A protein has these predicted regions:
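Hinge/cleft segment of the Venus flytrap/periplasmic-binding protein
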Residues: 310-359
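Beta-alpha junction/loop-to-helix N-cap segments that form part of ligand/metal-binding clefts
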Residues: 102-159, 253-268, 272, 277
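Extracytoplasmic "Venus flytrap"
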Residues: 50, 56-57, 61-87, 98-107, ...
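Hydrophobic alpha-helical segments within soluble ligand-binding/sensing domains
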Residues: 152-193, 292-312
Length: 359
């Protein structure tokens, strides 16, 4: 069954996600599980200051660390918050939720982690690979549930997906590079050169580049790389590749995702399809991907936190992989902008999700 999502091309406002009633960032005419009417859990510690609400400090504490404010991660936290409500948690009444955002600066992570250690959180949620790696220092005393860690083994946070021996487990947003590139080769049949932009400081992006190179070597493709250290480098990196490549591919790099509109404009102006690693990046104007629903990722993260608060050990919970829950997301407005036709075989597939920009 085809789904259609209408989406804006702007990043969620973080404070909107923390409000008591959060409107959905997308409108779906056929969502997998229906629209949730649950309000988000309000954080007792917003990123810019402490809440004035008086709470019982003896309540269980959930510390949440988010790396940066961008669509993918905001979807995860929004879904996480709503699922906590569905599970019976209400901030300030039977739980305390402490949310911190590193504002895209990894140098902020040690300070946040140390503050959570001092405050004795009962469980910490680490959203993204860099955050999970920074939170490893907590695991001697505090269970950690990570979310959106692309390759937990390579990141060093678990020995393997079923052997939880480092004090943390969670959910992975592993990018299926092969399936995304298969989609690219189906739609962009004449493509020979792929432009890949990434931050080499993000292990998730490095591992995805390795997978892309492996695919390229067996399919006769050439990879043109451009590395960036911050989102301000994205414009020049994308522009430098635009004349050299037939298509762009960016995985789930947080530095890129933070400034997706910049990359989208360069790609669209050059009429080059931009294949991406997350559904949310298609919502931000990217052309297409094959991947998971990040809402599911946030919900499952909340369920794992619930299990920890009820006494289950993280060692008893394997990493959750969404390998069978993949959808093909295509922004049909972007397709029109760059003049690309989508094969009927894709449009009629029950796993096809059409993304349209909200007018």
């Amino acid at each position: 069954m085809k789904k259609t999502l209408l989406t804006t091309l702007s990043t969620f406002a973080l404070m909107a996600l923390l409000s008591a009633c959060v409107p959905s960032s997308t409108e779906s005419t056929a969502a997998k599980e229906g629209d949730s009417s649950a309000a988000s859990v309000e954080s007792t510690a917003a990123q810019t200051g402490e809440s004035s609400k008086t709470v019982d400090e003896n309540l269980p504490k959930i510390g949440v660390i988010q790396l940066v404010d961008h669509t993918s991660l905001n979807i995860i936290y929004d879904a996480f918050s709503k699922e906590l409500v569905e599970l019976g948690y209400k901030d300030g009444e039977n739980v305390i939720v402490n949310f911190k955002n590193a504002q895209g600066d990894m140098a902020n992570l040690p300070t946040i982690v140390q503050s959570f250690e001092a405050d004795k959180q009962d469980v910490v949620v680490a959203i993204t690979t860099p955050v999970a790696q920074a939170a490893m220092s907590l695991t001697a005393s505090t269970p950690v549930i990570f979310s959106a860690v692309t390759n937990p083994v390579e990141a060093g946070v678990v020995s393997d997906l079923n052997t939880i021996d480092k004090g943390m487990t969670g959910t992975t947003d592993a990018v299926n590079v092969d399936k995304i590139m298969d989609l690219a080769m189906t739609i962009s049949k004449d493509a020979k050169t792929v432009g890949y932009i990434y931050n080499p400081g993000e292990d998730n992006s490095v591992s995805n580049l390795a997978a892309l190179k492996e695919y390229a070597s067996s399919h006769g493709l050439t990879i043109e790389e451009a590395s960036i250290s911050s989102s301000v480098d994205l414009q020049s990196a994308a522009s430098s590749l635009a004349e050299k490549v037939d298509i762009f591919f960016v995985a789930n790099d947080n530095t890129v995702a933070e400034s997706m509109p910049v990359l989208v404009k360069v790609a669209n102006d050059a009429k080059k399809p931009l294949y991406v690693g997350a559904d949310s990046m298609v919502m931000d104007g990217g052309f297409a991907t094959v991947g998971i629903d990040y809402t599911d990722l946030g919900k499952e993260t909340a369920r794992m936190v619930d299990q920890v608060l009820k006494g289950k050990k993280v060692e008893e919970m394997p990493v959750k992989v969404f390998k069978d829950d993949l959808y093909t997301y295509i922004n049909t407005d972007t397709a029109k902008t760059i003049g690309v036709e989508i094969p009927e075989s894709i449009l009629s597939d029950e796993k096809f999700v059409e993304i349209k920009n909200k007018k």
